[in-house]
C-alpha cells in the first residue's frame, strides 16, 4: 500500500539509510496519518535496530521529533545524545541494513513476508528493503552485489 509522506528505507539522511523513514513514521503517527497496521511495530523491528545503532532510546527520539525538529536537527541531536559514530561505522550500518534478508538470519522472515504480501514469485525482491519498497508500490533499487 502506498503511503504518502513515507520514504523508502533506501533513502539517506546525512549518510544513513532508514533514519528518515523512521522519522516519517513518527511524524505520520503524530498527525494520525500512519496506517493502523504500522502502529504495533513503532519502535520495533528496523526502528529498534536504528535506535540501538544511534544509542538513543526510541521514546526520546519521538519526543524530540514531536518538538518540531527537522531530520538534520534530529540526527545532530542523536549524535550528541547517543553514539558518536564515524563514517566507517555508518558504512557498516548502511550495508548491513541495505542487505538485510539477503542470505542472512532474516532470509526466512523475508520469504514469509513475501508470501504474506503476494510477492513469492518476485525473484528480484532479495532484501527486506526491497520488500518494503514493493509493498509500498515503489520501484525497486538496483542491487549492485547481485549484478
Where are these regions (language model features)?
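Amphipathic alpha-helical packing elements
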Residues: 35-79
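Amphipathic protein-protein interaction modules
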Residues: 61, 65-119
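Alpha-helix initiation and N-capping motif
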Residues: 16-19, 58, 71, 90, ...
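Polar/charged low-complexity regulatory segments
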Residues: 1-37, 96-147
